[in-house]
Swiss-Prot record:
GO terms for biological process: chloride transmembrane transport. Its main location: membrane. Belongs to the ligand-gated ion channel (TC 1.A.9) family. Probable component of a ligand-gated anion channel. Negatively regulates synaptic transmission and synaptic vesicle release in response to acetylcholine in cholinergic motor neurons. Role in synaptic vesicle release kinetics may be in association with the ligand-gated ion channel protein acc-4. Gene3D superfamilies: Neurotransmitter-gated ion-channel ligand-binding domain, Neurotransmitter-gated ion-channel transmembrane domain. It comes from Caenorhabditis elegans. Residues 1-18 form the signal peptide. Disulfide bonds join C190-C204. It is a multi-pass membrane protein. GO terms for cellular component: axon; presynaptic membrane; synaptic vesicle. This is Probable ligand-gated ion channel 46. Expressed in the nervous system, with high expression in cholinergic motor neurons and weak expression in GABAergic motor neurons. The gene is lgc-46.
């Protein structure tokens, strides 16, 4: 019997020790919650809680409600006093949406949730036996509490969403921890280097810091989560979000050192629109300009129309693209492409001008011959005898000395060794009179004299055959230029494409 009593005492001692161990392992808040429960030994020898309705009802009646807690802690609260002399603030950002990125103004817009957490011992209400161990409050009470007065120092605009009320969340835990949440619409700057546009990357950043307190009073740092996206994949029409970086730096100001929390967004431009609207049309325009090489040297008007229209179309395309870009002073990748393609079209026009110059028809110099009259019968003409000079083997005609200027002109016409008759010869009526006066020495009519001189001119060889061969050579040269251009222009354009795409797609 005594042995059984001894065993019962040992079991009771073990149960008491186990219950104390459970209380010791749990936090004070958990021990307060267990006041509403009874305990029993389970099949493994441990303790499990059993709800006691009487204890719950008694604890509910005696707990402090929200109004009592707020009235108590705010009665002696000083919002200008820094909690504990120095505060550690943890910041966490959740990106809800990135709406736009502007190339003209070099900025971006986004919606975020930003959380701030710090400890304020003056707001501790755990000792009041609260009914709730966290109080969810609105922005009205936040204006009465101490805050780190943090802001985005490099934002262009920052607005709190107010639909249907200010989107500010405040929670105060029983141990004095303050948790705030703001839903903001921000517009921040972007660093744009358009040298490789449209195959470039854009970096946008926002910097968050306490505006009033330096590191001696407020220390700011990222939380474990840092910056997170609310959606796995965020894409815009022109950009794709590549990565988000969080950075913590210490910056020196005249008033001391400040902690700055920077979140950097890296975007990659989507080049599909520019390929469809700029690159592919220019390929077609360049190919159209090459069609003129196959039309031949006789289709100068058609070739001119093709070249000019190609150049105008490319200029119009270039203007539509650059009007949506900032006016930068350096050369962009799209500038290199468009200007190079315009140069190819312009060179095809220069080739056309060269071919047109070579293939143009030169008008032969026509001589107006004096025709004999049909009513007057020609009389035989006996020209003066011709004497050969052995010294120079030239022909000298014996002739009467001219009496006046008209006869001198007529003699010059007769002695013309090249068979050339001036275009205006015979228009003056005095020449006919000179022929009549000159006919007495030749015993023939004036018309017969002219015919005689024309017959003599036909016996002299001309350059007709040489002029014809020169025209043929020019046409052959024009054809060769077109034949070479058909292969040279595409070959040079392919070389340009290889160099262009290899350079600008590197690192994209």
């Amino acid at each position: 019997m005594q042995y059984l009593q001894f065993l019962s005492l040992v079991v009771l001692l073990l149960m008491c020790h186990a219950r104390k161990s459970v209380y010791r392992r749990n936090s004070p808040s958990l021990r307060r919650l267990t006041r509403n429960y009874d305990w029993e030994v389970d099949e493994h020898g441990g303790l499990k809680p059993i709800i006691n309705p009487a204890k719950v009802e008694r604890a509910t009646k005696n707990c402090a409600n929200d109004s009592f807690i707020l009235g108590t802690i705010m009665s002696n609260y000083n919002r200008h006093k820094i909690p504990g002399g120095q505060v550690d603030v943890e910041v966490e950002v959740w990106v809800q949406e990135i709406t736009t990125i502007s190339d003209i103004t070099s900025d971006f817009q986004l919606d975020i949730y930003i959380y701030e957490t710090w400890y304020d011992p003056a707001l501790n209400y755990a000792f009041m036996n609260p009914c709730k161990y966290n109080l969810s409050l609105n922005s009205v009470l936040l204006e009465k509490l101490w805050t780190p007065n943090s802001c985005f120092i490099n934002s262009k605009t920052a607005d709190i969403h107010k639909s249907p009320f200010p989107n500010i969340f405040l929670m105060i835990y029983a141990n004095g921890t303050v948790w705030t949440n703001y839903r903001l619409k921000l517009q921040g700057p972007c660093i744009m280097d358009l040298t490789k546009f449209p195959f470039d990357n854009v970096t946008c950043s926002l910097t968050f810091e306490s505006f009033n307190y330096n590191t001696d009073e407020v220390k700011m740092d990222w939380s474990v989560n840092g910056v997170q996206k609310m959606r796995d994949k965020m894409e815009l029409a022109d950009y794709e979000l590549v990565d988000i970086h969080k950075i913590r730096t210490t910056e020196e100001y005249p008033a001391g050192y400040w902690h700055e929390l920077t979140m950097s967004f890296e975007f990659k431009r989507r080049a599909g629109w520019y390929i469809l609207q700029a690159y592919l049309p220019t390929y077609l325009t360049i190919c159209i300009s090459w069609i003129s090489f196959a039309l031949g040297s006789k289709a100068i008007p058609a070739r001119t129309m093709l070249g000019v229209n190609s150049l105008l179309a490319m200029t119009f395309q270039f203007g539509n693209i650059i009007r949506n870009l900032p006016r930068v002073s350096y050369v962009k990748a799209i500038d290199v492409w468009m200007l190079s393609c315009m140069t190819f079209v312009f060179c095809s026009l220069l080739e056309l001008a060269w071919v047109g110059y070579l293939s143009r028809e030169e008008e032969p110099t026509s001589a107006k011959c004096l025709q004999p009259s049909a009513q007057v019968a020609p009389k035989p003409c006996h020209p003066p005898p011709v004497q050969q000079n052995a010294n120079n083997s030239s022909v000298h005609r014996r002739q009467k000395q001219p009496k006046n200027e008209e006869e001198s002109a007529l003699l010059s016409l007769r002695d013309n060794d090249y068979g050339y008759i001036p275009p205006g010869f015979g228009l003056n009526g005095n020449v006919a009179n000179a022929m009549k006066s000159f006919s007495s020495s030749c015993s023939c009519e004036p018309t017969n004299v002219v015919n005689l001189m024309l017959d003599e001119a036909e016996t002299i060889p001309t350059s007709t055959s040489s002029s014809l061969s020169r025209k043929q050579r020019r046409e052959i040269l024009a054809h060769k230029i077109d034949s070479v251009s058909v292969f040279m222009f595409p070959f040079l354009f392919v070389l340009f494409n290889i160099a262009y795409w290899q350079h600008y797609l590197r690192g994209y």
